[in-house]
Regions:
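Catalytic machinery of carbohydrate-active enzymes
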Residues: 1-291
Length: 291
């Protein structure tokens, strides 16, 4: 049980969806500096958020006792008596009602995927602003850490959580070849569990492939890159967050709702591989002239 004043954050979803909540959590921490923020979710993602100062501690979403909690029956001792909470749960009202009894601050339940046609990160910030006196920056990327190192290599992530979001393996191979012929002599590919499972490694034979052991290692790898190009995925959201110059390809999804945030991020929306490749080169040429 926590004796210090505590505030509960609950998010059990995918990495990219979780990162879209980070501007809201950042703004909340600014107005609640003396509270210990406890996260409930996937251990790997909670630990990552903790490494960026968004959480102080966490509880794995599969921990014993949480089933009754998510059913709105009882609060486990490990959670204690939070003074307030934000719950990103599809059906979170029962849990919210349970937490409101001992709370002195608002307990807010937010639908993770609302019907409103607005960017999710902005929607989350506005939802919190109706309960807490937070200040939302004009650019949500101002909530992200400053980039500390100059990159040494370019990275391509050819996968995502859905095959429909991806282009053909040949597209990424051609892209890597063209990058090497320009200003990026070192170009690597990021392979995670989804790529290992759904992609044919032979399609990338002879390429430099990185397989980060966890998302914290992935964050370190991305931080050291001078360029990142990927699809609509959690990896792309993390690249934008750590400040890597990022180009995100939206083959089937809408960046107006799900777009990666960051200080140097470009969205390209086109299902045609030739057009997408052309747009990438236009973006790189613009960045080169800008620098």
């Amino acid at each position: 049980m926590y004796n210090k004043k505590s505030f509960l954050i609950c998010h059990r979803g995918a990495l990219g969806d979780f990162i879209l909540t980070w501007p809201a959590i950042y703004c909340l921490r600014k107005v609640l500096p003396h509270y210990q923020f406890i996260g409930i979710g996937r251990t790997e993602y909670m630990r990552l958020a903790g490494s960026f100062g968004l959480l102080d501690t966490y509880i794995d979403k599969e921990s014993a006792g949480l089933l009754d909690f998510f059913c709105g029956k009882s609060i486990p001792e490990k959670i204690g008596s939070p003074h307030g909470a934000v719950l990103w749960l599809t059906e979170g009202q029962k849990v919210a009602n349970l937490l409101k009894k001992p709370a002195s601050l608002p307990v807010v339940s937010i639908t993770p995927f609302p019907e409103e046609q607005t960017h999710l990160a902005e929607y989350y910030c506005l939802a919190l602003q109706s309960h807490f006196p937070i200040t939302i920056p004009q650019e949500l990327s101002d909530c992200f850490p400053a980039r500390e190192t100059e990159g040494q290599y370019a990275l391509i992530h050819p996968g995502s959580g859905s095959p429909g979001k991806n282009y053909s393996p040949q597209f990424y191979r051609v892209l890597a070849k063209e990058l090497r012929q320009s200003c990026y002599p070192e170009v690597g590919f990021i392979f995670g569990p989804a790529e290992e499972e759904k992609m044919n490694a032979e399609d990338f034979a002879g390429e430099w492939i990185e397989r980060p052991k966890d998302v914290e290692a992935l964050a370190g790898l991305l931080s050291g890159a001078s360029l990142y190009i990927g699809n609509d995925s959690g990896v792309s959201h993390l690249a934008g967050f750590v400040g890597t110059p990022t180009i995100v390809l939206y083959k089937t999804t809408d960046p107006k709702l799900w777009g990666v945030l960051g200080k140097k991020v470009v969205h390209i929306s086109d299902a045609n591989e030739g057009v997408a490749l052309c747009e990438i080169h236009k973006c790189l040429s613009y960045w080169e002239r800008e620098s």
